[in-house]
């Protein structure tokens, strides 16, 4: 069945209460593609890895996309996506979307091909080693990512780095993230 257009400002006015932590997303379409409206703030330390690209459009405010760049020796990098910007993230790029208060974006993801595996990965803040990784075939972004984040949060053993022994945080430390909305472009 053909759907009707969504007026984004009106949808936000009527439905912003649906954007709840820890992911703060709401799937508005989920047939062939998943189209999510995502609000801020969110506070997570995981990096999501999926085998298909992700398209980001920032409707209101700026967001920070933390990545581990597989094309540059797995270097940790920050990409700022400002209001009005769009960005296509290549497949298999570990990424942590950080959204700040009063920001809204749209994320578009392909339906996962049969047999594809999504991963949620946490890195040690001290030595950058992988602390924990959860994997699953993603059929429902809204629930599966949240479940992986909650399981990591509740299990200190999963959060303990095998290399240096540091216990990884499940949310960023207060003041550790620089809000690009408070800077000049």
Curated annotation (Swiss-Prot):
GO terms for cellular component: cytoplasm. A divalent metal cation binds at residues 124, 127, 161, 164. It is found in: Cytoplasm. It catalyses: 3-hydroxyanthranilate + O2 = (2Z,4Z)-2-amino-3-carboxymuconate 6-semialdehyde. Keywords: Cytoplasm, Dioxygenase, Iron, Metal-binding, Oxidoreductase, Pyridine nucleotide biosynthesis. Its EC number is 1.13.11.6. It comes from the Eukaryota. Pfam families: 3-HAO. SUPFAM superfamilies: RmlC-like cupins. The keyword Metal-binding applies. Its main location: cytoplasm. O2 binds at residue 44. One of its GO terms (molecular function) is ferrous iron binding. Its cofactor is Fe(2+). GO terms for biological process: 'de novo' NAD biosynthetic process from L-tryptophan; anthranilate metabolic process; L-tryptophan catabolic process; quinolinate biosynthetic process. Substrate binds at residues 54, 99, 109. Signal peptide: none annotated. CDD domains: cupin_HAO. Fe cation binds at residues 48, 54, 95. Pathway: Cofactor biosynthesis; NAD(+) biosynthesis; quinolinate from L-kynurenine: step 3/3. Catalyzes the oxidative ring opening of 3-hydroxyanthranilate to 2-amino-3-carboxymuconate semialdehyde, which spontaneously cyclizes to quinolinate. Belongs to the 3-HAO family. This is 3-hydroxyanthranilate 3,4-dioxygenase. It comes from Podospora anserina (strain S / ATCC MYA-4624 / DSM 980 / FGSC 10383) (Pleurage anserina).
């Amino acid at each position: 069945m053909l759907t009707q257009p969504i007026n984004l400002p009106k949808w936000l006015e009527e439905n912003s209460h649906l954007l709840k932590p820890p992911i703060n997303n709401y799937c508005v379409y989920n047939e062939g593609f998943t189209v999510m409206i995502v609000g801020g703030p969110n506070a997570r330390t995981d990096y999501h890895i999926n085998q298909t690209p992700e398209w980001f459009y920032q409707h209101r405010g700026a967001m920070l996309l933390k990545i581990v760049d597989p094309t540059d020796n797995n270097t940790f990098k920050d990409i700022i996506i400002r209001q009005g910007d769009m960005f296509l993230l290549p497949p298999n790029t570990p990424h942590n979307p950080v959204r700040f208060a009063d920001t809204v974006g749209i994320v578009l993801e392909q339906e996962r091909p049969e047999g594809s595996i999504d991963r949620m990965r946490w890195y040690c803040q001290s030595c950058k080693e992988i602390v924990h990784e959860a994997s699953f075939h993603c059929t429902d972004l809204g629930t599966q990512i949240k479940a992986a984040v909650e399981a990591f949060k509740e299990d200190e053993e999963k959060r303990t780095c095998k290399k240096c022994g540091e216990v990884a945080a499940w949310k960023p430390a207060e003041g550790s993230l620089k809000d690009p909305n408070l800077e000049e472009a």
